[in-house]
Amino acid sequence: MAAPEIPKKQKAVIYDNPGTVSTKVVELDVPEPGDNEVLINLTHSGVCHSDFGIMTNTWKILPFPTQPGQVGGHEGVGKVVKLGAGAEASGLKIGDRVGVKWISSACGQCPPCQDGADGLCFNQKVSGYYTPGTFQQYVLGPAQYVTPIPDGLPSAEAAPLLCAGVTVYASLKRSKAQPGQWIVISGAGGGLGHLAVQIAAKGMGLRVIGVDHGSKEELVKASGAEHFVDITKFPTGDKFEAISSHVKSLTTKGLGAHAVIVCTASNIAYAQSLLFLRYNGTMVCVGIPENEPQAIASAYPGLFIQKHVHVTGSAVGNRNEAIETMEFAARGVIKAHFREEKMEALTEIFKEMEEGKLQGRVVLDLS
């Protein structure tokens, strides 16, 4: 394919006042690919709750505050329009569709990378955090690390899967839940949660209980959950006895779930979720609560000793899990629930997130 014409300037959305939800559309230079890099003309980018945490500086786990002028975003899909020196060795060609993930670059050499945990790379670069993100029309990516997008999978559908889809798929694998076993998805109607429900129920043969606000019930059940639990119907001052008893009653012999995936960023959800487990159960922590860190309120030593429960974390998937997630979508096993918006709408989207009103995902049309 002949090389397309590449402009000198591009549109991008920056965080103009980190600590708030304010964004601004600006004009930036189109970058030149370096050695082993490709230039990607992005057409779509998902908007993730992680972007919200980064732009508002409410993720206290991050080492540095976000700086004004940061281009956010880490769920970008587009076409390769230029190859840097050496990039052809990757097999990529002009016109290939690829995706840019949360971890935009991993070294491939450190101990985590060598163990297949490139999401924990010691030398990682995070798209949209001290690295230019995907809320722009052109971005650079390492030729060996961008994710191929399968033919037949629309770019807008692929975008949310590059973070949300990959993240929950990896967390489901870490839960070690087996086909036919019960799994609870906390935050089941959110951007991550509704994808976790689909992958669990339709891709892995798990029996799913979705937990979320009542307004999310239709989406959660449509995604494949057998049961839905409305958290607003239960008290919080009873040490979560009522809701945990109810969730357990939905499982085989009332023993509880084999696993829980906490997709929401709620400290209360973490305290509840640990109590949903049966003996030898596993809770996987995915959602990152904002502001000052808090311990899980129900994490008493006696609980771990008496029930042999396990708690683990899951950040993002590796490059192979990203490819596997795309294959799920290409086969129609999963489909993100999303709406499309223009770049100029990003501030309003973040306001929806701030108010807890957002269902599913939002994908930016970057044209």
Curated annotation (Swiss-Prot):
Zn(2+) 2 binds at residues 107, 110, 113, 121. The keyword Calcium does not apply. Keywords: Cytoplasm, Metal-binding, NAD, Oxidoreductase, Zinc. Zn(2+) 1 binds at residues 48, 74, 163. GO terms for cellular component: cytoplasm. InterPro entries: ADH-like_C (IPR013149), ADH-like_N (IPR013154), ADH_Zn_CS (IPR002328), GroES-like_sf (IPR011032), NAD(P)-bd_dom_sf (IPR036291), PKS_ER (IPR020843). The keyword Cytoplasm applies. GO terms for biological process: alcohol metabolic process. It comes from the Eukaryota. Homotetramer. This is Alcohol dehydrogenase 2. It comes from Emericella nidulans (strain FGSC A4 / ATCC 38163 / CBS 112.46 / NRRL 194 / M139). The gene is alcB.
